[in-house]
Amino acid sequence: MLENKDNLKDLFSPIKVVLVGTTHPGNIGASARAMKNMGLLNLALVTPKEFPSDAATFRSKAAKDVLENAQVFEDLKDAVADCELVIGTSARDRKVPWPVLNPKESAEEVAKSALHHQIAIVFGREDRGLSNEELGLCNLHVHIPSDPEYSS
């Protein structure tokens, strides 16, 4: 177990959370808040519908610094250009030609790589996730099981 928050920040500093095509700015703020709670501070946004936004700031609560330091990109390729390991996420179980991991396996890959590499964890749009083309920019794909009736 980590002894203090500085160790957590050091451990997670190479990890970037990338949100693609976010349609509701409140989700950006909520993501920033969740990130900060977990010790993740690097946020990248790819073509968000609305950012910056009062709704994002309101939902972020004490994670305004994560929003203020967020980088905005026009495409996913640019957002992950500095990363050696790119993990695409999906609630759908897809047939893709690269490794599909469960969340535990994905966490193990991140832990192994974080010591020496920049890492991106990519989340897709609220309504349809990542496109196959966007998943093609990822080294790994993590399938996050969810309720089949509401897999947003």
Protein language model features and the residues they cover:
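Post-transcriptional modification and biogenesis factors for structured RNAs
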Residues: 1-152
